[in-house]
Amino acid sequence: MSRFWSQVVRDLTPYVPGEQPKIANLIKLNTNENPFPPSPRVVAAIQAELGDDAARLRLYPDPNADLLKAAVARRHTVSAQQVFVGNGSDEVLAHIFMALLKHDQPIIFPDITYSFYPVYCGLYGVEYQTLPLADDFSINPADYCDRPNGGIIFPNPNAPTGRLLPLDAIEQMLKANPDSVVVVDEAYVDFGGETAISLVDRYDNLLVVHTLSKSRSLAGMRVGFAVGHAALIEALERVKNSFNSYPLDRLAIVAAVAAMEDEAYFAQCCHAVMATRNTLTAELTELGFEVLPSTANFIFTRHPQRDAAELAKALRERNIIVRHFKLPRIDQFLRITVGTDGECKALTDALRQITG
């Protein structure tokens, strides 16, 4: 702590990102990265943008990222005026907390959810209230329909549980909260869920957030976007242009466009992850683990007779890293990224040895 710190900084409990260790021969299943590389079109687009001498890098990128907005609009059958883009979905979410979540009433989100939400509340002075998930870790939409609030936000599928809320439940929330923005954070929806973007033309209080880090294999480029009513998007643009007018660099823009346009590769990778997830779920169940239903690129699991922290430690000793959260209700669970078939086999072989 320094005497130069502001009171906001003194009061903050910062977000703790997933570990990015520099260990040789590591099987890294802790941060939900895609096990497959980006589309070959992404590599070609980056090379074309660089050219022979990378001279374009001396120039600022398009502050509006119009090419990317157009690609997102085409993909989701909306207008470009309904699309906002940012430096990863985390930046998009940060602007949402500043621009659209009311500060005169508490916002609401699940008690077990993406841990960046309370961090943003602390940073921007937003009051919040958490609502408990059901015993099966599902979200009960009725809980979000009978109380005043300054906004609603939740991941769908939820993180770190992987459980999906159907569109009719989201509509129930939207109808019950016409004067609050409902933010659906769909970082993992491409692995078996149905996007709520289909609802944005019917509800002016809906904002849907996506990332290209997971299903498009671009975690290293940091690209995210939001889709919603044009008035919501304008609010985000106003905050963005008061914070950083150039959030996406030239290479990120062309890489993201290429990734959005290669539908065949996208579908191939998503289907492969889903197939491996199903196999991993079956094998863990055979080993005695309880596995929550998942529509994400990870699974959330516990062993009824083995301590989760000890399991994570034993896996790490075998150069396999998974995520363990030291939080109430979930401290006996592990979140395991769906890796390649080979990585998941190494994981289950190790767990068989540890628990056998």
Curated annotation (Swiss-Prot):
Oligomeric and partner information: Homodimer.
UniProt entry keywords in alphabetical sequence: Amino-acid biosynthesis, Aminotransferase, Histidine biosynthesis, Pyridoxal phosphate, Transferase
GO molecular function: histidinol-phosphate transaminase activity; pyridoxal phosphate binding
InterPro entries from the UniProt entry: Aminotrans_II_pyridoxalP_BS, Aminotransferase_I/II_large, HisP_aminotrans, PyrdxlP-dep_Trfase, PyrdxlP-dep_Trfase_major, PyrdxlP-dep_Trfase_small
Similarity section: Belongs to the class-II pyridoxal-phosphate-dependent aminotransferase family. Histidinol-phosphate aminotransferase subfamily.
Top class in the EC scheme: transferase
CDD domains per the UniProt record, alphabetical: AAT_like (cd00609)
Pfam families noted in UniProt: Aminotran_1_2
Substrates-to-products reaction catalysed: L-histidinol phosphate + 2-oxoglutarate = 3-(imidazol-4-yl)-2-oxopropyl phosphate + L-glutamate
Pathway membership: Amino-acid biosynthesis; L-histidine biosynthesis; L-histidine from 5-phospho-alpha-D-ribose 1-diphosphate: step 7/9
Residues that bear N6-(pyridoxal phosphate)lysine: 214
Keyword Ribonucleoprotein annotated: no
UniProt cofactor(s): pyridoxal 5'-phosphate
Keyword Transcription regulation: no
Protein name: Histidinol-phosphate aminotransferase 2
The protein's Enzyme Commission number: 2.6.1.9
GO biological process, one term: L-histidine biosynthetic process
Species this chain originates from: Dechloromonas aromatica (strain RCB)
